[in-house]
């Protein structure tokens, strides 16, 4: 009678495939409780009234009115000089 030969490489391939299938099926069965993610998020939030971040009791203030005058207008040539591309230091000599 002729016996079929199974090579070692076929056995290794079969073990490898079975291992991947078992790992992937086990990974799908991991249960995450519904309230866990909400509890972590809510515990990171501050409780009660949040004090102002500045040293004064005024709280948050608006920026000064002259900020618009200090900004560079869009049609100014200065903006083109600032946005020019510069070659990297590795190029050239």
UniProtKB/Swiss-Prot annotation:
Residues 1-27 form the signal peptide. GO terms for cellular component: apoplast. Residues 45-93 are annotated as: Disordered. Induction: Induced by gibberellic acid (GA) but repressed by nitrogen (N). Accumulates in roots in response to nitrate and ammonium chloride NH(4)Cl depletion and to osmotic stress (e.g. mannitol). Repressed in shoots by nitrogen starvation. Residues 28-78 form a propeptide. Interacts with CEP receptors (e.g. CEPR1 and CEPR2). Extracellular signaling peptide that may regulate primary root growth rate and systemic nitrogen (N)-demand signaling. This is Precursor of CEP13. It comes from Arabidopsis thaliana (Mouse-ear cress).
């Amino acid at each position: 009678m002729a016996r079929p030969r199974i090579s070692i490489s076929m056995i290794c391939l079969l073990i490898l495939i079975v291992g991947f299938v078992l790992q992937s099926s086990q990974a799908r069965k991991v249960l995450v409780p519904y309230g866990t993610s909400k509890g972590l998020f809510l515990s990171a939030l501050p409780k009660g009234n949040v004090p102002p971040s500045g040293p004064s009791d005024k709280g948050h203030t608006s920026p000064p009115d002259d900020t618009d005058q200090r900004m560079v207008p869009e049609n100014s040539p200065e903006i083109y000089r600032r946005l020019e591309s510069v070659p990297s230091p590795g190029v050239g000599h």
